[in-house]
Every structure is written in C-alpha cells, then in structure tokens.
Amino acid sequence: MDISDEESEISESEIEEYSKTPYHLLRSETYYKVKVNGRLRCPFCVGKKKQDYKYKELHAHATGVSKGSATRSALQKSNHLALAKFLENDLAGYAEPLPRPPVVPPLLDETEPNPHNVYVWPWMGIVVNPLKETDDKELLLDSVYWLQTLSKFKPVEVNAFWVEQDSIVGVIAKFDSDWSGFAAATELEKEFETQGSCKKEWTERSGDSESKAYGWCARADDFQSQGPIGEYLSKEGTLRTVSDILQNNVQDRNTLLDVLSNMIDMTNEDLNKAQHSYNRTAMSLQRVLDEKKNLHQAFAEETKKMQQMSLRHIQRILYDKEKLRNELDRKMRDLESRAKQLEKHEALTELERQKLDEDKRKSDAMNKSLQLASREQKKADESVLRLVEEHQRQKEDALNKILLLEKQLDTKQTLEMEIQELKGKLQVMKHLGDDDDEAVQTKMKEMNDELDDKKAELEDLESMNSVLMTKERQSNDEIQAARQKMIAGLTGLLGAESDIGVKRMGELDEKPFLDVCKLRYSANEARVEAATLCSTWKENLKNPSWQPFKREGTGDGAEEVVDEDDEQLKKLKREWGKEVHNAVKAALVEMNEYNASGRYPTSELWNFKEGRKATLKEVITFISTDIKNLKRKRT
C-alpha cells in the first residue's frame, strides 16, 4: 500500500486518533522540531514563504489547517491538530520570537520621469567630440581608444561614428541592462554635466565655442534623431521608462516566487507523506522487535522447563538405584544371619551333617550369587552415573543447537538410561530369582521385551542423529570453505580501522619494538634496531623446538598457557620491557590457538570492535551495509 492509499484510509472521525503519533514525536523532538535557533516554525510546512512565526500566529495557523476546508488532506489536518495541542500544552509560556529584520527594497529614483523623459534601453551613453584641425581623426574613430577613455564607467561595448554633417565623432557606450548599468550611464552624464559639457551645453553652443567632448544619457530625442547615432540607437535598443522596467522586474520576480512557492508546497506535501509512512514503518518495526523479544523469552523459559524436567528424571533414577542397593544389602544381611545360625547347629547324624553341608553349600552359592549380583549392580550404577554425567555434559553443549536436535538428544539419553536401568534390574533378577519361579520368569520376559523395544527406539534415534550429524558436518565444511573464500576476498580490502576485517593470528606487532627503540636510539637507528629485533623474534616464534607453554588445571578443564618462567621470555622482559614481552606473549597465544602445529601466522575473520572471532552472519551483514560506504569513500 502506497502513501496515498494510507491517507485515504484516514477518515475525518479518525483525525483525533491519528494526531497522537505526531504529538508524541513533537514532544520528544525525535523527527519534528518547532523551536529552531530560538524561533518558532511549522515543522509540517517546511519551505513555505513564511517560516518564522510568533506564538499566536503559529497557533492560529495550526488551528486553521486542522479545521480547514475539504481541500486539506486528513494527514495535514491530523498533523496540524497535534501541533496545536503541543503549543497549548507544552509551549504555552514560550516568549515571542524576535521579529525578522525588514527586507529593504533597492533604492530607486522616487521622482517619476516626465512623459518626455524616456530612456533608450539597454542603457546607453552618448559622447560627441567636435574634430579640430590638430586632432587625430583616425584615433578618435578607434573604439578601443574610447573603451579605455570611458573605462571607469565600465561599459560593455563602445562604438565610434563619423557624423559628416556636423564634422564630429559620435561615440555610443552600451552598459548592462540592469540597475548597475543605469547607474553607470547616469554617472557618465553627471560627470560631463559637472564639466559643463552635457547635452544642454551641446545644443546651446555657438559656432565659435570651445571644441571639447560632450556626453549624456541616450533618450527618446536621440533615439528619433537622424544620422548614424539615431540609426544605431533604433537598431540596438528600445524606448522604456524607469517605471516600466521596474514594473516588469517586479512582475517577473512575483511570477518566479509563485512558481517556487508552488514547488515548495508540493515538496512539503510529499515530505509530510513520506514522514507519515516512515512513522508507520517505525511503529511496525518496533512491534516486530517486541514480538522477537517475547519469542526469545518464551524460548528461554521452555529451555529452563526442559532442564528442570531432565533434572527430576535423573533424581528419580538415582532414587530407584539407591532403593535397589538398600534391598540388596538387607538380603545379604539376612543370609549372613542365617549362615551364622546354621553354624551353631550340630548335626546329630550323618544325614543331618550332609543336610547341613548341603545347606552350607547352597548358602555359599547363594552368597556368591548375591555378591556377583551386587558387583553387577555396582557396575550398572557406575555406568548409569557415567552415562548421566556424559549426557548432562552433552546436553549443556547442545543447548545452542536447534530445538529439534535437542529434543531428539534428550529422548535418546532417556532411552539409554532406561536401557541401562533395565539391564541392571535384569542382572539382579537373574541372580536373585529361581529358574522355577514362574512369576520371576514372566517379569524377566516383560523386562526383556521392554528392553528390546527401547533398543529399537534407540537405534532409530541414533540413525536419525547420525543423519543430522552428517548434515551438520557437511554444513560445517561448507561454512569453513565460505570463511576461507571470505578471508581470501577481504584480505587487503579491510583493516583494523573497520569493525569487521581479516586479522593475521600469531603475527607479531612491530609497534612496541619501535616504541622502545625510539627511547634508546636516534630516529634512523631506532627503525633499523626495531626491524632487526622484530625479525629475530619472528624466527623464534616459528621455531617448533621452542615450546614456552605449560598446562594448568586438571581433567577436561586443563588448558595450555604461556609459561612466564621461560628463560627466553624472562630475558626478553628484562632487556626490552613489558610492552615487547606482552607483544611476543600475545603472538604465542594466538599461534598456539590457531596454528600450533605449523607455527606460522594464519588469517582469520575478526570482529575488531569486540576483539573476538567474527561469525559469518556478522561478516555478511557488514559486507551488505558498510562495504558500499567504504567504496564510495575510496572513490
């Protein structure tokens, strides 16, 4: 749906409801600002001719638009209704802004010209120079000469003519058609007038008057005169009054202002529509983020419930195991008590002795069977405990995997524990029960059937898990191949100045070496010494016979760390300081983690902002957003 469709959905009755969103945005000054540089303005009419308002003017403007005619869109009305509420509730005490300085119109000659005072336009000046016998006629007819002579009036063009009937040289200087040209032409006339050589003196001169140059502005009588001067003026110019030119300029300016005002109004309307669409999109995005947060919270709660259920199941198994162990101990005590009673009796006859021996033999056999059953039970218990611990560890490692694999793994673990429990119970039943006891045989058969069902179910789960693990390994292989291709493609393109880039893991940082050498040597010697020292330690890092590591911790928690007591490291720290020592130590840790067998630096995708290995998702996101900006900066 485009913006026009969204506007059409806002009815007159919904204007009050839709004004709430721009009202909150005005209060927070997130998108709209009413106060700009200490002045009040309408944020929804940016670009209008009137920008600065007094408080009452702006309030009247907002109220008028919100209750305007049908030509106003519902979006405009809702926005200006929000502005009116904002002024009433939040800016009621705002001081009146300083008035803008008035625009001073250009100073013009306020004296209206007489009807006969009509000028030639574009503005022109006339200079006539009677020719004396001593004058150089060819020089006076040179336009370049007159252009230099009249240069202080800045004419754009000068033309010289020979007027045969008056034996004079006529010069016409053309000026700019704007008011600066008019000022230059009148300045030329005033210059000759102060010298007593204007048009009036030229027309009133006597025959034997002094031969000198005369000058004035070209007017209607000059335009209508005969001769080369009149012909040139009628060809190159027209007759205009100052008021006509001023009126035409005002009309042109007003026309231009109207066109620009309409363009600004249309642009403001489009801007308001785009702003409204942006606000709706921002609100939709916020709802999506809230839903995502709720889903994440629900997933965390579900995971917690599953962990609690697994813990209760393990506790039940341990309780049943303890119960079986107590029952075995009780039966062993009963047998021992019976054996002691049998030993006290003396056989009076051989038959009784034989019977007593037979009872002892059976008692010993039963005792051995019980001991064997106890050992089997103990083994089963230990197996169950180990299995519980192993499953618990696997479960903690698999919490970050997909939920389907987690449920299947929990089911498999439960089946394995039940199978181990059934095996333990069967071993106990075999050693305790009598082969002729039908109830025992029936119970053992049921347990065997249940055990077979559990094994079959376990095999199905293992088959499914095997398929999933195969897919996971394939995915891991593809991910590693993708990482290598990204490393090859981004190497040299990105560096530590960007958030995501390629880092050489295990590469020695040369800066600490250069810093410490600058403190001991001159500038040139420091570079040489730093390069030599750094090269030496790069070779030491590549030496596989040097293993400055030790193991800390026990069992699965043991890890390799740098041995601070290594002689070479201790010597390096004494001679070159802690910073150089830490640089070598950091390179050792990275090399031991990423390429312990090869002992040479390797490339890795790195998140420089957080100081850790970057995920493929982070790299892809960075490429899609920041690489374009980076390329534009480089071009």
Swiss-Prot record:
Q: What does this protein do?
A: Forms a complex with IDN2 and FDM1/IDNL1 that is required for RNA-directed DNA methylation (RdDM) and that functions at a downstream step of the RdDM pathway.
Q: Pfam families in the record, alphabetically?
A: XH (PF03469), XS (PF03468), zf-XS (PF03470)
Q: In which tissues is it expressed?
A: Highly expressed in flowers and at lower levels in roots, leaves and stems.
Q: Which Gene3D superfamilies match?
A: XS domain
Q: What is the protein name stated in its UniProt record?
A: Factor of DNA methylation 2
Bias-annotated ranges (Basic and acidic residues): 350-365
Record's keyword annotation contains Coiled coil: yes
Assembly, in brief, is: Forms a complex with IDN2 and FMD1/INDL1.
Coiled-coil blocks: 289-471
What happens in the null mutant? No visible phenotype under normal growth conditions. The double mutants idnl1-1 and idnl2-1 show a late-flowering phenotype and reduced level of DNA methylation. The double mutants fdm1-1 and fdm2-1 show reduced level of DNA methylation and repeat-associated small interfering RNAs (ra-siRNAs).
Tell me the segments the record calls region Disordered. Answer: 350-376
